[in-house]
C-alpha cells in the first residue's frame, strides 16, 4: 500500500492515491535502531471495498526482502509467487499476515492426508505474521533488541488439545517459528494465570516474546523450521528449542548450519527445512 517513493510522506503523517484512498498515520512507535511500528487510519474513496480489497487490487505480494528479483513488474513471477508463497491450509479469504509461515510451505494436500491416515491429528491457529519477522538484530546485546509483536488466535479445539495432550504419548509439533512463539506465549500466559486468557474457549492474544538461550520452552515438543537469515531473532528461538535452559543450543545450531551449507541445502523462505525432535 505504501510504495518506496511515498515512505517519506507516510513517515510525515499522510499518504494515499487520488480517488482510491487516503491514509493518515495517527500513532507511531519508532525504534532507536531505525524503523518502527505505525498505526494508520484509512479512508476508502471508492464506492465499494475496504482496505483489504484495495490492497488486493493495487498491492504487490510482500515477499521477504532477500528475494531481490523484480516483483511488481514481473507478472509471471508474481502469479507464481501468489501460488507458491502460501500454505495449502491457509484461510485464503482471511488474509491477515504480511508473510507466509514458510515451514508450512513443505506440506501438500497429499502429505496432510497421509498424516491423517496414519492417525496424526492436525490443529489450526491463525498467525498475523508481521514484517518484523525479517528485522535483524542490530543492538550490541541480545537483550537490547526491540522485539516485534504479532497477534494470534487459537481456536477452542486447538486450545483443548494443547492443554490436555501429554508430550510423552503425543508430542506437540509446531510448524514454524511463529507457530512456536504463539504456542509458547499461550503456555506462559496460562501458567502465569494471565487474566486476559479466558478460562475456556478460543484465545486471542499478542505475542511479544523474545526467546533466546538459556530460556526454556514448554509450548511445543517438536518443530519444523526453515534455515534462516544471520542475526535473525528466529535463530535465537531455534537455539533455545534445541537445548532449553542451556547455552549449548548456540553451538549446536552453528554445527547444524555448517552441515546444511556443506550439503548445499537451500536457505530462507523457498528453501529446505529441518525437523527438531
Report the location of each language-model feature.
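Surface-exposed, charge/polar-rich loops and edge strands
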Residues: 1-277
Amino acid at each position: 500500500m505504501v510504495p518506496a517513493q511515498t515512505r517519506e510522506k507516510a513517515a510525515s503523517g499522510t499518504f494515499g492515491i487520488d480517488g482510491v484512498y487516503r491514509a493518515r498515520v495517527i500513532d507511531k512507535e519508532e525504534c532507536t535502531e531505525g524503523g518502527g511500528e505505525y498505526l494508520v487510519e484509512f479512508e476508502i474513496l471508492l464506492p465499494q471495498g475496504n482496505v483489504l480489497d484495495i490492497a488486493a487490487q493495487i498491492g504487490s505480494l510482500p515477499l521477504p526482502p532477500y528475494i531481490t528479483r523484480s516483483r511488481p513488474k514481473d507478472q509471471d513471477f508474481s502469479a507464481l509467487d501468489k501460488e507458491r508463497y502460501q500454505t495449502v491450509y491457509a484461510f485464503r479469504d482471511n488474509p491477515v499476515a504480511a508473510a507466509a509461515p514458510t515451514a508450512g510451505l513443505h506440506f501438500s494436500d497429499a502429505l496432510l492426508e497421509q498424516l491423517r491416515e496414519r492417525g496424526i491429528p492436525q490443529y489450526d491457529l491463525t498467525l498475523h505474521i508481521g514484517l518484523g519477522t525479517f528485522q535483524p538484530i542490530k543492538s550490541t546485546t541480545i537483550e537490547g533488541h526491540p522485539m516485534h509483536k504479532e497477534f494470534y488466535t487459537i481456536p477452542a479445539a486447538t486450545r483443548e488439545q494443547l492443554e490436555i495432550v501429554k508430550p510423552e504419548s503425543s508430542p506437540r509439533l509446531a510448524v514454524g517459528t511463529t507457530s512456536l512463539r504463539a504456542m509458547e506465549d499461550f503456555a506462559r500466559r496460562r501458567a502465569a494465570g494471565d487474566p486476559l486468557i479466558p478460562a475456556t474457549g478460543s484465545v486471542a492474544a499478542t505475542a511479544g516474546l523474545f526467546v533466546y538461550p538459556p530460556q526454556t520452552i514448554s509450548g511445543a515438543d517438536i518443530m519444523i523450521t526453515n534455515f534462516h537469515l544471520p542475526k535473525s531473532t528466529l535463530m535465537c528461538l531455534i537455539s533455545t528449542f534445541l537445548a532449553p535452559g542451556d547455552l549449548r543450543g548456540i553451538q549446536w545450531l552453528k554445527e547444524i548450519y555448517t552441515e546444511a551449507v556443506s550439503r548445499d541445502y537451500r536457505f530462507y523462505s523457498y528453501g529446505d527445512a529441518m525437523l527438531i525432535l
